[in-house]
């Protein structure tokens, strides 16, 4: 089902019932989907608030991501970035505020319905089917799209070639390296032709030598006019490929701007990056 594709239950302690409700998948990744508007789309949040009892963990957070750009969502532990990210994904319901895809209010949409509107989600934890081959992992998503069989076959071969999975296409999910697994997960997510992809800790569990490979893949998604929202504790790896970034601190947005602007801001360096931080952009971006 859809929840097994680009969706994973993060098992958030305070939101078990919300997650269960949000992961109630419908019959198809395309059935009942809202029509996508032509041109550049914008995914945005307006004044999101999340409270647990008397404690406010996110206070009036507004962010936006346009198609064809990579946006980082950063912050120290306890800053509210993960909660803000999960509200945008649809795993957590905000107490206040709204989430829009262009002018469509998707605040109450469960994750599977957001996928139908063109929002893909790649969880931090491994989401490949461990006992299925790489090609079957991808094909299982294509089968849910209601596309013609010939299209599904062509799309499968295209994704396997693009993500250099030819040598491991028959390997089961539990036989893949961290980098191979990530490439398979991204390829599978692209099977539904998303307009946006939410990346949760994409560099976690990946060997250092494979990190740049994943960065290049994410960067090239811009060529598909896909908007990317990344949240990751690996600040250098994230800022090195983002167009813009938001820094959350104590539940609020402390700063937003380009990676260069963040790296040069005195308050950001004092509270988060440290004075020794040096931004290193990737050569493949030039």
Task: For every predicted segment, state its role.
Residues 2-7:
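Short, small-residue-biased leader/transition segments that mark boundaries at the very start
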Residues 74-76:
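The feature captures the beta-strand-to-loop junction immediately N-terminal to the Walker
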Residues 193:
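Conserved catalytic motifs of ABC-family nucleotide-binding domains
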């Amino acid at each position: 089902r859809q929840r097994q594709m680009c969706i994973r239950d993060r098992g958030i302690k305070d939101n078990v019932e919300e997650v269960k409700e949000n992961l109630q998948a419908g019959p198809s990744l395309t059935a009942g989907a809202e029509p996508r508007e032509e041109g550049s789309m914008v995914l945005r949040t307006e004044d999101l608030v999340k409270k647990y009892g008397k404690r406010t963990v996110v206070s009036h957070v507004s962010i936006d991501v346009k198609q064809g750009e990579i946006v980082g969502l950063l912050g120290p532990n306890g800053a509210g970035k993960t909660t803000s990210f999960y509200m945008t994904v649809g795993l957590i319901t905000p107490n206040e505020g709204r989430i829009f895809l262009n002018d469509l209010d998707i605040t109450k949409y469960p994750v599977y319905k957001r996928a139908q509107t063109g929002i893909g989600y790649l969880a931090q934890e491994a989401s490949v089917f461990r006992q299925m081959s790489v090609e079957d992992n991808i094909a299982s998503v294509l089968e849910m799209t209601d596309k013609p069989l010939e299209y599904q076959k062509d799309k499968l071969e295209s994704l396997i070639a693009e993500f250099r999975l030819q040598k491991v296409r028959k390997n089961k999910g539990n036989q893949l390296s961290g980098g191979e697994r990530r490439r398979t997960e991204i390829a599978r997510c692209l099977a539904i032709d998303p307009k946006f992809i939410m990346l949760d800790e994409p560099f976690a569990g990946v060997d250092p030598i494979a990190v740049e490979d994943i960065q290049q893949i994410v960067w090239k998604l811009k060529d598909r006019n896909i908007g990317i929202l990344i949240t990751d504790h690996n600040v250098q790896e994230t800022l090195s490929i983002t167009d813009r970034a938001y820094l959350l601190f104590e539940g609020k947005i402390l700063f937003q701007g380009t990676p260069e602007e963040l790296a040069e801001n005195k308050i950001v360096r004092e509270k988060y990056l440290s004075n020794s931080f040096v931004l290193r952009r990737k050569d493949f971006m030039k």
